[in-house]
Amino acid sequence: HAGVLAMTFSEALGSGIVRHPTVACFLARTWDFLIGVGIDSTRIRFRQHASTEMAHYADDCWDCELHGEYGWVECVGIANRTCHDLLSHEQHSGSKLLRAWRQFDEPRSEARDVLAPNGASLGPTFKDRAGDVMEALQNLTEIPESMPFELTLADGSTARITDDMVTRRSEEVTLHGEWFTPHVIEPAFGIDRIIWHILDHCYTETQKKGENYSIMRLNQSVAPFDVAILPLFDKDGMDDIARQIWASVNSMPGLRGELDANKSIGRRYARVDEIGIPWAITVDHTTLEDGSVTVRRRDDQEQVRASIEDVLSKLASDSISTLF
C-alpha cells in the first residue's frame, strides 16, 4: 500500500500507478465534473482497488471518494473492464462479429504466415460458399496451430478447413488496417451521494443580528436560479421594471431568473442566500431616476451599482463577476 500521494493525473499515468491513458482521462474528467458542480477540491481523493478486492473482469479499478460529515464516502467508481465481456462472448459463441476495424493512416507491410486457399479442393467442397471461405481465409489474423479447424465466415457461419484445402506459407503482405476487440471503461456515478456532498460542501451558517444565517454557496451551474430580481417595493414602477428585467433574463439561453417581491428586502436576500442563488438584482428608487440597479453577490454580500443594460449584457456573457 503506497499511502496517500498528491500528483497530477499525468504523473500518475507516467509512473504506472494509473495503468491506462483512457482510465487517466476518465479520472481527470470525473475531477473536472465534480469541481464544476461545486465539490470542494480539497475533499476529493481517488483510491485504487487492491488486486484482492478488484472485480474478476477488471484490470484496474478506482473509487472517487468525497469527504463530508460522515467521513470519506465512495461516490464514483471507474473500472477498466478491458475486453472481458466481448472476448468471453466471442470465445463461447465462436463469432468474431463483435470485433471492430481500425484503418491505418498509411498501409503497412509485414511478413506473416498465411493459409493460401486451394481452389481445387475448396470449390467442390463448399460450392457457392467457396468465395466466402476464401475471403475469410485471406482475412485470418491468427493462424491455427493444427488442422482441421473451424473458420468463421463474415455472416457468422463456420466452415471446417482441412489440410488439403490450404497451403501454409510465409509471405509479405500489405495491411490497410486491423481487426481488434474494443475495451470498455465503465464509470458509475452515485448521483444521490454527489448531490448530498454538494450541499454538505456548500452550506455555511453564520450569525447575523443575533440570528442564525444560512448561505448555500452553490456553483451557478447547479443553482436553482442564476439570478434573483428583487423590486425594493412592489409599486411605483419598480415592480414593472423588475418584471421587464426578469423577462429579459429568462429569454437568454441557459439562464433562469427568479422574481421575488414578497416581504422585506432583507428577508428576500436571506431567502436568496439560503437556496443558493449566486446573484441578486435590486430595483429601487435610483433605478427610476437613472436606470441603474444594485447587483449583490451572494458569497460575501458585496454590492455594486450598474446600468440595467450592462448587467444584462454581463449575465448573457457569464461575466457578471467582473462588475466587482
Feature map (PLM): residue ranges:
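NTP/phosphate- and nucleic-acid-binding module
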Residues: 1-324
